[in-house]
């Protein structure tokens, strides 16, 4: 298992939880570092998304370059994790890319995605004016949204409570790996 620091933390926790040795998990640095796996040279190209340290894979094999990206979000101000870097992508592709393989959840939407930075002030307004307790839900892996909610809650003078094992595990991993500072 080759992965960046945040995902390695989560993977090692899972391996330990199920009694498997965690030395199967290899932590790699982001691009331009590449790892050789069989005939492939693979680099982890930072790509903004709701999950910290998301990466597209730059795969060099037999003189060709392929780029494989899971879901992505072009966000210049993601709040957590690296912003999308068009210059880095231009540099990686300057000598040509044989194939770009990707998917995007909102590919058919006519609207540009919102940056996480634009969501915080709106959430803060809602939390500041709401009466009584406010409950917000999100995927535990959406660390950027968890941080946005926590920061907005704190600024609005509210107490923030995390519920759920996965939510706590993701926040712990974020703090341990430096993805979140507070």
Where on the chain are the PLM-derived regions?
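His/Asp/Glu-rich metal-coordinating catalytic cores
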Residues: 1-182
């Amino acid at each position: 298992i080759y992965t960046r620091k945040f995902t390695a933390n989560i993977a090692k926790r899972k391996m330990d939880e199920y009694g498997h040795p965690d030395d199967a998990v290899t932590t790699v640095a982001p691009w331009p570092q590449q790892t050789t796996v069989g005939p492939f040279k693979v680099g982890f190209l930072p790509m903004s998304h709701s999950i910290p340290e998301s990466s597209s894979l730059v795969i060099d094999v037999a003189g060709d370059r392929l780029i494989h990206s899971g879901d992505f979000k072009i966000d210049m101000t993601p709040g957590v994790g690296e912003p999308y870097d068009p210059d880095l992508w231009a540099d990686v592709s300057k000598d040509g890319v044989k194939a770009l393989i990707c998917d995007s959840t909102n590919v058919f939407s006519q609207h540009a995605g919102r940056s996480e930075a634009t969501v915080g002030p709106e959430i803060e307004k809602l939390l500041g004016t709401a009466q009584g307790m406010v409950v917000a839900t999100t995927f535990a892996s959406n660390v950027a949204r968890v941080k946005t909610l926590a920061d907005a809650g704190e600024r609005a003078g509210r107490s923030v409570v995390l519920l759920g094992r996965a939510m706590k595990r993701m926040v712990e991993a974020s703090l341990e790996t430096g993805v979140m500072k507070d």
